[in-house]
Amino acid sequence: MHKFPWALAMLALFGASPARAAAPESAASEKPAPETPRSPDARRVIDWIAATGDNHGLPYAIVDKQAAHVFLFDARGKALADAPVLIGIAPGDDATPGVGKKSLAEIGPAEKTTPAGRFLAKFGLAAGKQRVLWVDYATSVAMHTIPKGNPKEKRRERMLSPTIDDNRITFGCINVPIAFYNRGLRPQFLKKGGYVYVLPDTKLLEAVFPPLHVQSYRKADASS
């Protein structure tokens, strides 16, 4: 399975542009940048949010775990930026009960999952007074840049690689490129927070987002 184009990942990580955010207008940049492909599940969730206003007037991000990618939208649903991500090393969509109270050394390999679901995310402080976007504070899942940590993990190289499987390396947190974090995520979420929709990698999409059942029925009725 392949990721999105290598060049896009390079731009997102090193900040040549704000993770595919718009560049200044010029004669050479009149053509709109091509959109990063979105998976069918990502498109379904994006369409559902747009149709129902599920974000309640707040910015939101879609984390597609199977594609190891995040898509950022403003409060009105305008696509702002997208970037590759690193996620929990263990497949799965549920956090282990009590995992948020454990130290990193106490978390077992099977517990290092990035839970799926809809989360009201807000900025706050983590260990070491690092400011992060808390996706699910109870389970200690946050969205932040790649930590210094252990260089043997090669997180930067994993984010740049053309494959998806090696993007599973974290304890459950969602690592994003610096440019995406500083120029996209933080300006949008800093004041009031926003919603983070984490798509599943083992469960059915409708099991994680039940309203999609209703959305499917409405589309079926409209086409009949």
Place the predicted regions along the sequence by residue:
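Bacterial N-terminal signal peptides
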Residues: 7-15
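Cleaved targeting-peptide boundary
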Residues: 21-32
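Gly/Pro-biased beta-strand-loop elements
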Residues: 41-155
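N-terminal targeting leaders of membrane proteins
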Residues: 34-40
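Intrinsically disordered, low-complexity coil segments
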Residues: 31-32, 70, 183-184
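Exported/periplasmic cell-wall-interacting domains
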Residues: 22-24, 112-224
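A subset of N-terminal targeting peptides
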Residues: 3, 16-18
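Bacterial N-terminal signal peptides that target proteins for export
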Residues: 1-7
